[in-house]
Regions:
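Short proline/glycine-enriched turn/loop segments at secondary-structure junctions
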Residues: 95-96, 125-130
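Short beta-strand-plus-loop segments that form exposed binding edges in beta-rich domains
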Residues: 118-126
Length: 146
């Protein structure tokens, strides 16, 4: 049974000021600044960069991943419970200098207590672009279950 939640659940987090370095390979997005975190006392953790589902239901998430220059392959992903990985847009080769960004969207079913992370991949070390315009992890509850 679907139910209309009595409390909304939505968050957006970004990389705060500065442009941190990003090592090569898969990295959990260091989104350490909440833009908002509504519902059930907040469900996004700025220390471990995880969203934890407060109720069972269908959720939608997006990850926008941006770096400054010459990534040797790049993609944005969403990972559920440390194992199930959804990958969005992807480039396989070095595409030259300048800003590059990728986005991943996913709608998924979560149980109460499941966690979700934004995963950023580059084939070489990079520098993140900062701010919500360039790097953000966001999500919301679409439908709760009784």
């Amino acid at each position: 049974q679907n139910a209309v939640p009595t409390t909304s659940v939505a968050f957006q987090a970004t990389i705060s000021t500065g442009n941190p370095s990003k090592s090569s390979g898969q990295t959990v997005k260091p989104a350490n600044q909440e833009m908002w975190d509504n519902g059930y006392g907040g469900n996004y953790n700025t220390s471990n960069y995880r969203f934890t589902a407060p109720v069972a239901g269908m959720y939608q998430f997006s990850n926008t991943h941006s770096v400054y220059s010459s990534p040797n392959g790049m993609w944005a992903g969403i990972k559920v419970n440390g194992s199930t990985l959804y990958v969005g847009t992807k480039i396989n080769d070095n595409v030259g200098s300048g800003d590059h960004n990728m986005t991943c969207y996913v709608t998924t079913q979560l149980e109460k207590g499941d966690y979700v992370e934004a995963i950023d991949y580059t084939g070489n070390s990079q520098t993140y672009s900062s701010g919500a315009s360039w790097n953000r992890f966001e999500g919301s509850l679409i439908a709760a279950y009784k």
